[in-house]
Structures are given as structure tokens and as C-alpha cells.
Amino acid sequence: MPQIDIHPEWYNDSKVYCDGKHIMTIGSTKPELHVDIWSGNHPFFTGSQRIIDTEGRVERFMRKYNVQKTADT
């Protein structure tokens, strides 16, 4: 026999807040959700993230250990 009333209450209009601002409305088991980061302020999604490593790994190794490049034979 299945158990009755074991599922959490579902809220179709749960509000999501970030920094005190209402961001979106979703379905959830909690009436309000407070998040620190979302796609609207994350550097990856906003395009403000920069790739710092422009030099390859092999070149860094060669420079670090002062290895001279030689011609392949």
C-alpha cells in the first residue's frame, strides 16, 4: 500500500531573489529562494570573464626549465 502525504508541498510561483532583487518565478518546494549567483551576474554568462593564460603549457614548461628547442631528427 503506498504511503500518503510523503511528498513535499509544491509551489508553482516560487520567487527567486538575488541581492534582494526579484529575478524570476519558478516552481519549487520552497516559496522563496535566495541565491548569491545566477546567470545574470556570473562572469561566464555576462562575458566579463577573460582568459588570462594565453601561452601554451609546453611553452611555459620550456621557459620555466630553460629548455632549448631542438630540431626533430
Swiss-Prot record:
Its main location: plastid. GO terms for cellular component: chloroplast; ribonucleoprotein complex; ribosome. The keyword Metal-binding does not apply. GO terms for biological process: translation. One of its GO terms (molecular function) is rRNA binding. It comes from the Eukaryota. It is found in: Plastid, Chloroplast. Keywords: Chloroplast, Plastid, Ribonucleoprotein, Ribosomal protein, RNA-binding, rRNA-binding. InterPro entries: Ribosomal_bL28/bL31-like_sf (IPR034704), Ribosomal_bL31 (IPR002150), Ribosomal_bL31_A (IPR027491), Ribosomal_bL31_sf (IPR042105). Gene3D superfamilies: Ribosomal protein L31. Binds the 23S rRNA. Part of the 50S ribosomal subunit. Belongs to the bacterial ribosomal protein bL31 family. Type A subfamily. This is Large ribosomal subunit protein bL31c. It comes from Palmaria palmata (Dulse).
